Swiss-Prot record:
It is found in: Membrane. Residues 30-143, 145-255, 257-373 form the CUB domain. The gene is Cdcp2. Its main location: membrane. Glycans are attached at residues 40, 267, 377, 435-436. The keyword Repeat applies. This is CUB domain-containing protein 2. Residues 1-24 form the signal peptide. Residues 25-516 are extracellular.
Length: 540
């Protein structure tokens, strides 16, 4: 108990050291550190008028591993449309870091209940030199089982996790996103007493689509990932009178901290960008494209906490990309600081980007753009190009939206593919010399434009006629890609293979025409046979 109290006081001293704490007019006492499991506080003189020129700061610190539930009993502050005069600010952590700000409030409408994503919360009250009102009264409590969760992200777990949970408990959590955004829930650990139909101890999630809604989960198998139909998910945990387990731990993501992108091109940024991102959050962005596509991700701006000065690794705030739909997929890259990394390309049609921030130090965050790499097969002979793209990969585009050089060289639909067969003297092709090699170059256009929005993807198609080798390169010719807009990024070349496999696999192909080799081999064989015939005739 003394150790916990000492830790709380030490944490309070550290957090208060970064903030002036209580700054009120002479003679007014307010603010301070609240470390009891629950309590109440109010503006000076409440319910009478609060004084002018007052600033009070309360730091609420409860036991590590718990959260703080803050509710308001009364609220009456001078109104202003931007709360620029008298106001109350609520922080998810220390008030010295603006990235922790949950909201600024004034007027007579009380703030909603807030639950912190960790065991620290700050409240700041400010009044100017004009107009005073009754002020506010608020209460807080250490929230160990259930509650309303409104942050961008956070953690919920069974009571006393990772120790065994107690018997005869029932917890209800309501995870609420701001506005119309969805809520995502991911279980990272799960051990609950198992039974047929999970009749004894169980976890249930309400607000998800389909049969997952209200389904009971128990045992050791982690429940699936849930995404709400609306802007709320409810989680229920219940245990009976005997037999327990380690319980569960889950991460939730809401609002601008979790999104799924399915368009073939897009961009997104960290919460509050280019303002300071919040501390102590964990955000998921999933890019999910049709099968066969790969995803190329460009970091356009990066302003995160610097790496560890000793190890030079991103141990604190960082952005990470995974080659798949979960954090268990292969890591494509992990970044922090301010140095812009090169683009990364997935090996499949899904990418997960994760932003993790710790409890201190924030920056402006990041801005990201991505583009889907269309799966295609490109080959050439000494005289022409051939391009094959699965029509299913481009659905619902019409063939006229795919063309080489100009719209007059549009693709033809052949079976289940879009096909372009073009001679080198047509379709905008031109001869160039690169690295002392003569190449034929043209541009393939794929038009994803919709009404009022231009979106044309460009690929440079290149052939070395002498070697009959062809390749395709994504041209980043859009303002969406910022500093990469003027560059041509060479996509990873996949090994040549069967045509059917090519259309289902990675997008950029290098193929070689072997017809000349076969022809030369036949000529040599014919020559050898002719010499043998002549020798036989001479011997006769």
């Amino acid at each position: 108990m003394l150790a916990e109290l000492g830790a709380c006081l030490l944490l309070a001293m550290v957090l208060l050291d970064s903030d002036p704490g209580t700054q009120a007019m002479e003679g007014v006492k307010c603010g301070g550190v609240l470390s009891a499991p629950s309590g109440n506080f109010s503006s000076p003189n409440f319910p009478s008028l609060y004084p002018y020129n007052t600033e009070c700061s309360w730091l609420i610190v409860v036991a590590e591993g718990s959260s703080v539930l803050l509710t308001f009993h009364a609220f009456d502050l001078e109104y202003h449309d931007t709360c620029g005069f008298d106001f109350l600010e609520i922080y998810n952590g220390a008030s010295g870091d603006k990235g922790n700000l949950l909201g600024r409030f004034c007027g007579q409408v009380p703030p909603p209940p807030f639950t912190s994503s960790w065991h620290v919360m700050s409240v700041v009250f400010h009044s100017d030199k004009h107009v005073a009102s009754r002020g506010f009264s608020a209460g807080y409590q250490k929230d160990v089982c259930g509650g309303v969760l409104t942050g961008l992200s956070g953690v919920l777990s069974s009571p006393e996790y990772p120790n065994n949970y107690p018997n005869n408990v029932e917890c209800h959590w309501l995870i609420r996103a701001s506005g119309p955004a969805a809520v995502k829930l991911v279980f990272v650990d799960f051990q609950v007493e198992g039974s047929d139909e999970c009749m004894y101890d169980y976890v249930a999630v309400l607000g998800a689509p389909g049969p997952a809604h209200g389904h009971h989960y128990c045992g050791r198998t982690r429940p699936p990932t849930f995404v709400s139909l609306g802007h709320e998910l409810q989680v229920v945990f219940k245990s009976d009178f005997n037999i327990g387990g380690r319980g569960f731990k889950a991460h939730y993501f809401s609002g601008e901290c979790q999104e799924v992108f399915t368009a073939v091109r897009g961009n997104f940024s960290s919460p509050q960008y280019p303002g300071a991102y919040p501390n102590n959050i964990r955000c998921h962005w999933t890019i999910r494209l049709p099968p066969g596509y790969r995803v190329k991700v460009f970091i356009l701006d990066l302003g995160l906490e610097e790496p560890n000065s000793l190890t030079r690794t991103c141990d604190f705030d960082h952005l990470a990309a995974f080659d798949g739909a979960s954090e268990e997929a292969q890591l494509l890259g992990k970044w922090c600081g301010h140095h812009l990394p090169p683009p990364v390309t997935s090996s499949r049609n899904q990418v997960l980007l994760l932003l993790h921030t710790d409890r201190s130090t924030s920056g402006r965050g990041f801005s990201v753009a991505y583009i889907g790499v269309v799966p295609m097969n490109v080959s050439c002979s000494r005289t022409d190009f051939q391009i094959l793209i699965s029509a299913q990969a481009l659905a619902p585009l019409e063939r006229t939206k795919v063309y080489l050089g100009s719209r007059s060289c549009a693709a033809q639909e052949v079976g289940s593919n879009f096909r372009i067969q073009a001679r080198f003297d047509t379709c905008g092709t031109e001869s160039q010399r690169r690295n002392n090699t003569s190449v034929i170059v043209s541009v393939l256009y794929i038009d994803f434009s919709t009404a009022g929005h231009d979106d044309i993807h460009e690929y440079e198609v290149r052939c070395e006629p002498r070697r009959k080798e062809a390749s395709a390169h994504l041209l980043s010719g859009s303002d969406l890609l910022g500093p990469y807009a003027a560059t041509a990024e060479h996509l990873q070349e996949a090994p040549p293979g069967d045509e059917a496999e090519v259309l289902e696999g990675p997008g950029t192909m290098v193929t070689q025409d072997t017809s000349d080799i076969v022809f030369l081999g036949l000529c040599i064989l014919a020559g050898v046979l002719m010499i043998i015939a002549i020798v036989v005739l001479m011997l006769l």
